[in-house]
């Protein structure tokens, strides 16, 4: 049996679940818990695409798109695995940031490394604490 171990809310003692959230440029609605395939958007590009080394993505299980909790990943772009116009990550996962410096360090990270600090360079006004 698969058991997730994400962020446990100290007030409820329950695992936090964050929905898949994707937005398309010029579209009024934000889409939640639906992949591009679910929506029939086979050629769309999200507002924040997985298009470059260091794209920061939110993780969820393969079984559900609404069970993200506390895990994320850095997209390590490889042209042969992600040919132009055929990025299968877009619309299945949500990007929420980009690494802008330190790519040499990024490529050396392992799952056992610890992030000590992060600086938000733009967009802090959009942060919703305890949302």
Q: Whereabouts are the PLM-identified features?
A:
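Cross-family detector of peptidyl-prolyl cis-trans isomerase
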Residues: 2-131
